[in-house]
Each structure stands twice: as C-alpha cells, then as structure tokens.
From Swiss-Prot:
Intracellular or extracellular location(s): Cytoplasm
Acetylation listed as a keyword: no
Protein known as: Cell cycle protein GpsB
Gene3D superfamilies assigned: 6.10.250.660
Keywords, alphabetical: Cell cycle, Cell division, Cell shape, Coiled coil, Cytoplasm
Keyword Cytoplasm listed: yes
Database matches in Pfam families: DivIVA
InterPro entries (UniProt xref): Cell_cycle_GpsB, DivIVA_domain, DivIVA_fam
Coiled coil regions, renumbered to chain: 34-71
Organism: Bacillus velezensis (strain DSM 23117 / BGSC 10A6 / LMG 26770 / FZB42)
Example GO biological process: regulation of cell shape
Length: 99
C-alpha cells in the first residue's frame, strides 16, 4: 500500500552513489546527511507499521462491539418492560391483571 507511493527506501538511499566532480560536495557531508535520512525513513516505516497494526486492531474491536450492541439493547428493552410491568402491578394493584 505505502510502497506504491514512496519512491525511495532506506536501502535505496544507503546504496546511492554520487559522482564526484572537480568542485563536488564533500563526501563526508553527503554520507552524514544520507545517514540521517535513512534513520528517518526507518523510523517512519516502523511508525507506519505500528499505526497500521493498531488501526487493524481497532477496526476488529469496533466490529466486535457493534455485533454485541444489539444484544445489549434487546436485554435492556426487556428489563425496562419487566420493570414497567412490576410498577403497574404496584400502582394499579393486581386488579389490572386479574381482568
């Protein structure tokens, strides 16, 4: 998924060779900078993997919670009806249910 969008990997950066010219860049500076970029790429890659795993886990939890929710709702409705029935018996007496 992400590999399709990213053009360079940490390995590509590490293995990149630069041609030197008469007045080219200092090799040491280029290497240090590339090392920083490689570390950043590795950090970003690791963070992305962790976030994708967390995202997958949260989606599974959401799916499980949404499956359980209707059962809880039905139970709650049943409990409410039962309590209402008991209150009616108490308020109106048993005459309401004897008829």
């Amino acid at each position: 998924m992400l590999a399709d969008k990213v053009k360079l990997s940490a390995k590509d950066i590490l293995e990149k060779e630069f041609k030197t010219g008469v007045r080219g860049y200092r090799q040491e500076d280029v290497d240090k900078f590339l090392d920083m970029i490689i570390k950043d790429y590795e950090t970003f890659h690791q963070e992305i993997e962790e976030l994708q795993q967390e995202n997958l886990q949260l989606k599974k939890q959401l799916e499980e919670a949404s499956k359980k929710q209707p059962v809880q709702s039905n139970t709650t409705n049943f409990d409410i009806l039962k309590r209402l029935s008991n209150l009616e018996k108490h308020v109106f007496g048993s005459k309401l249910y004897d008829e």
